Amino acid sequence: MPAPTPKRADGRGATELRPFSVDWDPMSFALSSLIVRTGRTAVLCSVSLEEDVPRWRRGNGCGWLSAEYRLLPGSTPQRQSRELMKLSGRTQEIQRLIGRSLRAVLDMDALGERTLLIDCDVIQADAGTRTASITGAWIALRRACDLLRSQGVLTQDPIRQQLAAVSVGLIDGTPLLDLDYSEDSRADVDLNVVTAGDGRLLELQGTAEQAPFSRSELDAMLNLAESGLQELMQGQRHALATAAGSAIS
């Protein structure tokens, strides 16, 4: 007899995403900005442009993309101290993940010698901040590139394809999609999945928190993530359709 599906605090089914939404233009001076919300998790994502590249990148006509990630002080139940002189290992890991994922779907040659700077600042953390950051940052990046093309700054579209990320967990033997904190903190397995629009994987981050997991359990979690990512990508396209200056509909 199969184990009963764990009850989720917010009433969702095992295969349901948290509510997903995007609020546009919270910042007047950024090239592109938005607040992405997945349930109670909210991340401010913004894109800025620099007409330069890192020194080691100069002279070859190619651009660059860099990402920064921070938890704002009031984003968690206990205040997060600002990371000033030294970043925590977690912060460094996450911002590298964000930058690495976005660069994988970006044509650096099409940028010319310019740098796109991505900032992801967590306003409220209820788990899934890294996946929300990636999903929201891609939307902001897509719009920024559309605006740069409309202004004549870019002559080619540097974005090769879509990108999104989601978490999956295993609780009491049952795969659950898009964990909130109450689930993430007790999951037997925590898995973050990043994929491109064509379905190919960009990154898997999986950890057995309590006990090893099987190949069949991994496959079940990946299948669940795939369905959630398709839905998130629809949400991305819908968000872009509501924003001026985007080519996606």
Curated annotation (Swiss-Prot):
Q: Give the record's family classification.
A: Belongs to the RNase PH family.
What's the subunit arrangement here? Homohexameric ring arranged as a trimer of dimers.
Q: What is this protein called?
A: Ribonuclease PH
Query: What does this protein's UniProt record list under function?
Result: Phosphorolytic 3'-5' exoribonuclease that plays an important role in tRNA 3'-end maturation. Removes nucleotide residues following the 3'-CCA terminus of tRNAs; can also add nucleotides to the ends of RNA molecules by using nucleoside diphosphates as substrates, but this may not be physiologically important. Probably plays a role in initiation of 16S rRNA degradation (leading to ribosome degradation) during starvation.
- Taxonomy, superkingdom: Bacteria
The reply to whether Transferase figures as a keyword in the UniProt entry is yes
Q: Specify the enzyme's EC class, one word.
A: transferase
Keywords (alphabetical) are: Nucleotidyltransferase, RNA-binding, rRNA processing, Transferase, tRNA processing, tRNA-binding
* Signal peptide positions (record): none
Q: Which GO terms describe its molecular function?
A: 3'-5'-RNA exonuclease activity; tRNA binding; tRNA nucleotidyltransferase activity
Q: Which PROSITE patterns match?
A: RIBONUCLEASE_PH
Recorded catalytic activity of this chain's protein:
tRNA(n+1) + phosphate = tRNA(n) + a ribonucleoside 5'-diphosphate
Concerning Gene3D superfamilies, the annotation shows: GHMP Kinase, N-terminal domain (3.30.230.70)
